């Protein structure tokens, strides 16, 4: 079982994120192509552990990250459950949606249906009850903000 460094917050600086109350590290770890099913799972764990041991508390994902869309969330969720669960309150998990995930008129872009369904699916893949930040991945010219 992973045990985090006791000095993990000594070198990293953090900045307030708007009015949210969240403090984001100056460096976050994006998990796009390095957490898909084609990557080595042992390397994924070491990358997350090294980041967290150095004060990186924000892990950025998306519903389509892989390769194989969704696999980055699934792999990160497994690491979180099996190794980092004790530290969940110290970790910021963000995910996003906006790119194609399934067939039909609600499989991408920015409809309310797509975004809510994507968030629900992301939570299931990661085995989480919530994410700390949910982004819209790209503008949708057909859906007004």
Model-derived segments and their meaning:
Residues 102-145:
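Glycine/proline-rich, positively charged
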Residues 1-91:
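N-terminal binding-site loop/beta-alpha segment at the start of enzyme catalytic domains
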Residues 33-35, 65, 99-101, 137-140:
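Feature marks short, surface-exposed loop/turn motifs that line or immediately flank catalytic pockets
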Residues 29, 61, 95, 133-136:
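Conserved beta-strand positions
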């Amino acid at each position: 079982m992973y045990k985090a460094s006791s000095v993990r917050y000594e070198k990293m600086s953090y900045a307030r994120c708007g009015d949210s109350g969240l403090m984001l590290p100056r460096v976050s770890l994006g998990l796009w192509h390095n957490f898909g099913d084609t990557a080595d799972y042992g390397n994924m764990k070491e990358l997350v552990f090294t980041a967290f041991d150095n004060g990186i508390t924000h892990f950025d994902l998306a519903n389509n990250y892989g390769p194989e869309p969704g696999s980055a969330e699934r792999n990160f969720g497994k690491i979180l459950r099996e190794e980092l669960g004790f530290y969940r309150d110290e970790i910021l998990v963000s995910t996003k949606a906006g790119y194609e995930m399934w067939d039909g008129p609600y499989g991408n872009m920015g409809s309310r249906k797509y975004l809510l369904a994507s968030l629900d699916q992301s939570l299931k893949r990661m085995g989480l009850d919530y994410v700390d930040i949910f982004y819209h991945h790209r503008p949708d010219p057909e859906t007004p903000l």
